[in-house]
A protein has these predicted regions:
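Short, well-ordered turn and helix-capping elements at secondary-structure junctions
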Residues: 42, 87-88
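Alpha-helix C-terminal capping/helix-to-coil transition sites in glycosyltransferase folds
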Residues: 77-79
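Phosphate-binding/catalytic loops
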Residues: 88-138
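Conserved active-site segments centered on acidic
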Residues: 2-73
Length: 138
């Protein structure tokens, strides 16, 4: 009997964990189902996910309504394979990770829904590319 393959652990980090990192986690959980264990967190977590994020992700068939922003202390104390920052605007947190990737993605906070859609589509594209690269390195 072969041992089950260990899932790749990835964490997406932004400031509030209310917009960008939540969208990235949502896409990674759907597109990497069964292959990756996905986390997200914020260096200064907000009290709730931005309602526009919930709305634009629902347009893609991904329901984030039950999720809530988490802080770095909420992450499990394990080494991550990938740490993806969304442009933290500050030094990014010390989370133990084998590989750190910086995505400079603008925060759509306070912008119209069309900007949220643009950011969502950019994140979807980045997550898809990351998962392809990850699979090719297996």
């Amino acid at each position: 009997m072969s041992m089950p393959k260990e899932k790749i652990k990835m964490v997406f980090i932004c400031v509030e964990n209310a917009r960008r990192s939540q969208m990235a986690q949502g896409f990674a959980e759907v597109f990497g189902k069964g292959e990756v264990e996905v986390f997200s967190a914020g260096s200064r977590p907000s009290s709730q996910i931005d309602p526009l994020v919930i709305e634009v992700m629902k347009e893609k068939g991904i329901d984030l309504s039950g999720k809530r922003p988490k802080g770095l202390n909420d992450l499990p104390p394990v080494e991550m394979d990938y740490l993806i920052t969304m442009g933290c605007e500050e030094t990014c947190p010390a989370v133990l990770s084998k590989k750190i990737i910086e995505w400079d993605i603008p925060d759509p906070k306070g912008k119209p829904i069309d900007v949220f859609r643009e950011v969502r589509d950019l994140i979807e594209d980045r997550v898809t590319t990351l998962l392809k690269e990850m699979r090719s390195q297996k």
